[in-house]
Structure formats: C-alpha cells, structure tokens
C-alpha cells in the first residue's frame, strides 16, 4: 500500500492538471455550460463539470479518478489474511508503466471506464469475502453497482465489464445452486443497466435536444466498414447507396482507398470530399448497404473487421496508434471560456520520451495481459478461491 500511495503522489506530481485532447476539452465545455454539442457520453461531461465546479479545470477530477484506481489496487491486499513479499516489487513495477504513471493523468472517458471497472470488480471481490455478513455485503455490492453502472455509460463497450461482473456475481452467490446463481447474475446485470440508464438520464442538460450519440456512432461504423470493403475489394459494388445518390457514391468509391486505414477512423474526417459525400447519402441507404455487406458478402465483411482488429490487438507499428497523449490542445473558442490554453511544455516532452521506452516492449502488448489474466484465473479456479 505504501508503494501504491507513493506511486499515486508521483503520478499526480508529474501529470496535474491533466492532459486534454479535443474530446476532453469538448466534454469539459459541455459539462461547464450544461449543454450538448457532441455525441460523447453525457455522464462524462457531467462528471467533468461537477468537479470543475469545485476547482476550475480537471485537477480535482484527475486526483479523484486516480485515487479510485490506486485505492482499488491497494484494497486487493485486504482479500487475503497476509500479503506476499512479492506484492511490493510487483506494485512498484506496475506503477512505473505508462498505463499507471501517465494514463491516469489523461482526461479521457476510456480512463474513467477502466478505473470504474477495476473499482467495481474489487468491490465485488470484497463482497464475496464478507458474504455471510449481509450489511457489509450489500455495502460492497452497492459500490460495485455504482462504479460498474458509471463505467458502462462512459464507454461504448463498457457494458462488457458489467457482463463479466454478473457472471462473477452469479458464481459467488450460487453456493452450489445454479438457479440461484443465474438469478443473482441476471439481477445484478439488470441493476447495472437500469442504474446506468438512470445516471445518463439525470446527467442530461435539461434543455438539450434529443441525444443522437448511439445512432451517430452506428453511422460512423457503417461508413468505416463500407469504405474498408471497397478498399480491400474494389469489385464490391455499392449498388444500394448508388441508387439513392449516384454522384456521392461515385466520390466515396474514388476516395475510399486514400482515406481508409485499419489504424484509425479519423482519416476519413480529414477528407472534406468524402465527408460531404457520406453526409449526402441517407442513413437508410447506408444501413441497407451495410446489411448487404454483412449478410451477403460476409467473407469481405470479416476481412474488414480483421484488418481493424489487427491494428487494435496487435498493431504492427504502435507509434501510429496514439499510444499516449500529453499536453493540452483544442480549438481556442472551446478553451478560452474554460480559462485553458494550449500546453506542451518540457515536462510533457519528458513524459512522452519516458512512454516511448515502453512502446515496443510487452508492456504495450495486449497478449501479455490476456496471458496474465488467464494464468491467474486458472490458478484461482484450481485453488477454489474467489
């Protein structure tokens, strides 16, 4: 715990008041003025605005968010009667990675999701430890519910953590009776979904227009898949889109090879021509074409998905995938009302240099963490430990 406390203080000293990209500033702007301008999660904007109400900027938010994460790691020692001497060096090694030393200072919804997921699952583990004590059990379960519900609302795929938590809850509560386990698991999952939906509803600005975040996100995925399809296989025809707008579809087909990359979806945003053409084609036509790709050209669809996930899971050149973000950068009209200014100072340069030491090491390999998780899960199951 001492190592983690020292790590938290070192991280805060190196990163406060935090690192903000355009998305960070845009959501802080929404939270400060209680408006909706982007399709980012309303709950995250509200959280940033809430902490900004106490101390201007993101210093307090970063501190609380990081304290949640480091506190959750420290709480793991309470799950066993005694802690191995290995805990201190392992904790020190973890603290030195960019994921803990730098990422905790980045004001991104992804980091909040990760911290909430870890905190929620640690609460669930403590609930298992004190299960016979109903009062303490429900306190831990309430903490898990709040954190997992919040996490599910700030990241598009955040609900996955809730699914895994529901499986764990069912296992813990079953006590050898599978029907009881299913009831607890389903009940826990429904509670997270309901609580998360309530959080988002309450965080919505009172006079904001109808939220289009989900539909906008789906449309972006549709565009990305279709552009990828015509890039990987020029023979694939966009007939359904062409029937709705032949001129726009022609531009899309011409520009797709230059704008598609499995690395990031952002490249499409840099080409005004293809952006305008995509906007000209109706949602109905694009969706019909997307269904055609998925169900009538499934092999090509899977090729597109494979290319995307190849860069997600095992990027050939990690430097191209924004492995770290430092400083503050956003349009001046968004930063000025928040009393923010562009920042990339010497300390940011040094942190960036520090992060690059890890780029081509196992620290940035997803496979390492999958392997560690699998080994630990197998060990705990073999030892019959929660």
Task: Give the predicted meaning of each segment.
Residues 15-27, 35-47, 55-59, 282, ...:
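Extracytoplasmic catalytic/substrate-binding loops of multi-pass membrane glycan-assembly enzymes
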Residues 56-60, 307-386:
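Membrane-interface anchor segments at the N-terminal boundary of transmembrane helices
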Residues 42-46, 54-71, 88, 103:
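Loop-to-helix entry region of an early transmembrane alpha helix in multi-pass inner-membrane enzymes
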Residues 207-340:
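Membrane-proximal stem/loop segments at transmembrane-domain junctions that anchor or position
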Residues 63-82, 119, 123:
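Transmembrane-helix motifs of polytopic, lipid-linked glycan transferases
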Residues 9, 140-155, 166, 188-192:
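Membrane-interface alpha helices of multi-pass inner-membrane proteins
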